[in-house]
Design a protein with these regions (language model features):
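Conserved N-terminal phosphate-binding loop of PLP-dependent enzymes in the Aspartate aminotransferase
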Residues: 1-430
Length: 430
């Protein structure tokens, strides 16, 4: 099949995610990828693109990583998948023990799903159900404005990015929203949170937030002090706290898990994306013993948490996740990332010379800036298309440009990316 036929048949049969398909006819080229290695994607003309967004924030250690490949192949020879109700297997037992070993001792029970949105759904249902078991009629959730937690109904309900939620408002769950903090500016948000809790605490099952970074919310970064104080207020008032670390977990925020920078422990920790290094779908909700014990009862009491997915606990995905943890353990990843993050941040300062580049910011291995003064113009799309010509895969959030690379990117490759970005931005000078 030649390249044009491949593109034509894709557009004939496939409806791509988060895409206005008409754009592929006018504004955005559809690029078939033939192979990938390390930080590079290769198209059918053997042109290479640096994966600046870790393929939607999932790839940590490069495409076709030799070690993860090896572990996946080994697992393929023994077990690919089994029903995870009434059965178990070695990869998931090992993974669960290792995850719990990395977390605060209070987070000790793992419930698996197969994507980030599903992890949020699990946590929401668990929090609601736990309150039901305790005899409390709490049917609302508290969340932040500008939040994004996924695109299933429950996850959308606790989100606040209008492009995703607006059309579905009539069918979403009832939620209470708090002004999102920004940077060190947290007092107004905290006060609003306290006021809502003071008047509604008997109705609120849980508070959901992405600690430190609202990723799909234009990479809004905010103080760990807000996370700490908000969590304390909620837990002191009998409100469960759900941390969505689907994007920021596994080293992305600068620590292995973002909550570790905040001095508090959530009641539910949702993890996905980087957990398998970008290989296979997997997510997990890690919760506390006291929550688990609420559901632990004789069958006839009907307290079971009856939630399941066909591919829950997939052995191949778990083998990849164990390989990812091996790499973290043996290669001192988080410490190396601190050095790399500092280098990237210093290099990014050259972009500050443009008057239309505002709010240069970073947290761990997430870097972003905003293009201002272009209201009504799709400058982010222009950056995307110009990036492709220079061999960069960028995927701006509107006019917010971000850089979220695999951890294996070299300093030389970083310089190429940022110098190329500078050349692209030169075109926007008036």
């Amino acid at each position: 099949m030649d390249l044009q036929t491949l593109i034509q048949q894709d557009l004939k049969y496939i409806w791509h995610p988060c895409t206005q398909m008409q754009d592929h006819e006018k504004n955005i080229p559809l690029i078939p990828i033939k192979s990938a290695k390390g930080i590079y994607l290769y198209d059918f003309d053997n042109k290479k693109y640096i994966d600046c967004v870790s393929s939607w924030w999932v790839n940590l250690f490069g495409h076709c990583n030799p070690y993860i490949n090896q572990k996946l192949k080994e697992q393929l020879e023994s077990l690919e998948h089994i029903i995870f109700a009434g059965f178990t297997h070695k990869p998931i037992v090992e993974l669960s023990k290792r995850l719990v070993g990395l977390l605060d001792s209070r987070l000790c029970k793992c419930f698996y799903a197969d994507n980030g949105s599903s992890a949020i759904e699990v946590a929401l249902k668990m929090a609601f159900h736990a309150n039901v078991i305790k005899g409390k009629k709490k049917n609302k959730f508290l969340c932040l404005e500008n939040a994004y937690h996924g695109e299933t109904i429950g996850a959308l309900s606790v989100g606040d990015v209008g492009i995703y939620t607006e059309v579905y408002q009539p069918i979403l769950l009832e939620t209470l929203k708090v002004k999102a903090p920004c940077g060190e500016d947290i007092e107004e948000s905290l006060q609003e949170l306290k006021e809502i809790i003071a008047s509604k605490k008997d109705e609120i099952a849980a508070f959901v937030l992405e600690p430190l970074i609202q990723c799909a919310g234009n990479m809004n970064m905010y103080s760990s002090e807000f996370v700490k104080e908000a969590t304390k207020v909620c837990q002191e008032n009998g409100i469960y706290v759900i941390f969505d670390e689907i994007a920021v977990g596994f080293g992305r925020s600068g620590s292995m898990f973002a909550y570790q920078q905040c001095g508090v422990v959530p009641d539910f920790l949702c993890l996905s994306k980087g957990i398998t290094g970008g290989y296979l779908p997997l997510s997990v909700v890690v919760t506390k013993e006291e929550i688990y014990q609420l559901f632990y009862a004789p069958y006839y009491e009907n307290k079971s948490f009856l939630h399941s997915h066909s591919y829950t606990g997939n052995a191949l995905a778990c083998a990849c996740a164990n390989a990812v943890l091996d790499i973290f353990e043996t290669e001192n990843v988080c410490e190396k990332n601190k050095i790399l993050s500092e280098f990237i941040w210093k290099k990014m300062q050259i972009l500050g010379e443009f008057a239309f580049v505002k709010n240069l910011r970073h947290c761990g291995m997430v870097f972003a800036f905003d293009l201002v003064g272009f209201e009504g113009q799709r400058k982010g799309l222009e950056v995307f298309n110009a990036g492709l010509k220079k061999g960069l895969l960028l995927r701006p959030l509107g006019n917010t440009i971000y850089f979220m690379p695999p951890y294996i990117i070299t300093q030389e490759q970083v310089c190429f990316v940022i110098d190329s970005l500078k050349e692209i931005l030169e075109q926007f000078r008036v």
